[in-house]
Amino acid sequence: MYALYVFGDIIATILGTIPFLIIYLGSLVTGSLYTLYYHKKEPYYSAVGASGAVSGIIYSSILLFPDMQLLLFFAIPIPGYVFGVGYLLYSIYGMKKQLGNIGHAAHLGGAIGGFVLTLALKPELFFINKMMVLLLAVPIVLVLLFSDKLKSL
């Protein structure tokens, strides 16, 4: 919830309360839908939580401020866009390896929702920083293209 507090404040301040709620709830839905899709052949799979929504908020904040400095392991400063791409790549790896009791598919689906909804609410981002938008889109596009193959790798 700390991540929601920190990153949510960025979105609420820049875009406003209603856009924040749209991104949060939309990411919650996309995270849930992607999880259902990814685990469609696992009838006993269950998950609970709002991690997809929080992931959408994080990815939205990074899209708004890709050069923000984040601390990796509370000590190593890295740019937001590096964290964003790394976060999604780790989620893909976690989905493949089924790491821990974590909803990696929800994280990925929520990030996709946060990315798409932020661009829908603030389309000028694409024109202001086209290369960064494309860089942040790469892991999303890869997942959407190869999602069915992810489990069989």
Ranges and model annotations:
Residues 1-153:
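A detector for small-residue-rich transmembrane helices and their helix-helix packing motifs
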